[in-house]
Amino acid sequence: MHRSSQTVRALLFDLDETLLDGSRLQESIVRACDMIAAGQPGLEAARLVEANNEVWLDYWPEVAEKWTLGALDGESLSLEAWRRTLRACGCHDESIVRLAARIHRNLGREAHRLFDDVRELFTSLKSARVPLALVTNGASDTQRDKLRVLGMEHWFDVVVISGEVGIAKPDASIFRLALNKLPAERENVWHVGDSLTTDVAGAKAAGLTAVWLNRSGLVRREGDPEPDLEIRSLSNLMAFISE
């Protein structure tokens, strides 16, 4: 893999599974179902978990684009998912729907955490005064809440959320929105993300240097977008920035 020989003047980052580790989210659903069932006679936690998984398999394809582009907010998404889950278990009480969504939201906030290599990198980038932007797909309320809960709001000079602008990765336009607000030319800007299809493909379409954060050591398949640089950890990134 090649990488740009240009000096890095600004960095763009993806959020989920690049900076935020969502591996505990399924656990938060199980815990939520335990808590909901404990307070509601007739509901079984295991059946709630099963129903919730089934609901998401059917419901997510219906609403993914709406949620990503801002036509559906995260709160409404969650309420409807729990409404369908509880109905599948014989519960039609809207107060329980609201309770379930609130319990899961709070547990989901606890489940999100930064990967271990994130804080050190951003401390170094801030010390080096590298302009930073976040480019993330998702509903505004969902993504803004993650930034607030984890204290990341002040980390970025620019934040572009697909649900706020009506454009999503891999559309090159969303990268250009961030680029237009940064004091750097595109040949000096790198985008770092975990997805070949949204991050790498989109960044390359926008003329940026695409850095694939491949934490789990996935093997690219024939025809997959090719990154300009592949790294296994964000701790590897500063070495290139410092050159």
Identify the residue ranges that each predicted region occupies.
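N-terminal helical cap/lid subdomain that shapes the substrate entry/recognition surface
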Residues: 5-116
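Asp-based, Mg2+/Mn2+-dependent phosphohydrolase catalytic module
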Residues: 1-11, 22-23, 43, 92, ...
